[in-house]
């Protein structure tokens, strides 16, 4: 049985040559399995913002510190560095108790039409926080490697530069904290 598995199937930049060096978020496809249910995989043919989704997932490793983080979906379709996604998303609730996290209320909205939602009603799984965290930290490592092996991004203005710095500061802080706690 697969309690929780999440993988990046592919990761790339926007296809437009005009945007390839100024795209600040990686895009691609995920495979997510929760409580033995496939939530998303290659068959869905949906493109997600990989880097911002992984930051959202990194935020979910520990109980939320503020309400703003709680209401950011786990898997975002778009939104750039501000993480202001359209309605297309994948999300689930998390309940933390001691060293256990419960994942439930999973849903996938696959268009901007509010009726295009799949609710995974039977999904309700308890796993060790360490297991949940390690899956996410592996993704974060992949995102970091992807960005490290790409040409330097072109930051068009002060706003891009500030957003970029803030994004990577938080990403790296949460990644390092998670690695120190869950891989020692």
Language-model region placement:
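Short, basic/low-complexity N-terminal boundary segments at the transition from targeting/disordered tails
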Residues: 1-11, 65-78
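N-terminal "first-domain core" detector
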Residues: 1-54
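Short, well-ordered strand-loop elements centered on a beta-strand within folded domains, enriched
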Residues: 22-25, 30-31, 64-76, 99-106
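Non-catalytic recognition/regulatory regions in large multidomain proteins
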Residues: 23, 40, 48, 53, ...
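Short loop/turn segments at secondary-structure transitions that flank enzyme active sites
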Residues: 38, 63, 109
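Short, well-structured hydrophobic secondary-structure segments
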Residues: 42-76
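An exposed acidic His-Trp-rich patch
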Residues: 73-133
């Amino acid at each position: 049985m697969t309690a929780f598995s999440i993988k990046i199937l592919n990761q790339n930049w926007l296809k437009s040559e005009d945007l390839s060096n100024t795209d600040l978020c990686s895009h691609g496809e995920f495979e997510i399995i929760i409580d033995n249910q496939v939530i998303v995989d290659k068959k869905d043919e949906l493109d997600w913002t990989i880097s911002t989704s992984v930051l959202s997932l990194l935020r979910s490793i520990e109980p939320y510190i503020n309400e703003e983080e709680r209401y950011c979906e786990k898997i975002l379709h778009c939104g750039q560095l501000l993480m202001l996604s359209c309605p297309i998303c994948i999300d689930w609730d998390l309940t933390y108790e001691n060293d256990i996290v419960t994942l439930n209320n999973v849903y996938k909205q696959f268009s901007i039409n509010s009726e295009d939602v799949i609710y995974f009603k039977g999904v309700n799984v308890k796993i060790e926080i360490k297991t949940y965290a390690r899956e996410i930290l592996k993704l974060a490592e992949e995102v970091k490697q992807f960005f490290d092996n790409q040409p330097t991004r072109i930051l068009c203005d002060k706003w891009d530069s500030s957003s970029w710095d803030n994004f990577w500061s938080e990403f790296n802080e949460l990644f390092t904290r998670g690695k120190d706690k869950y891989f020692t």
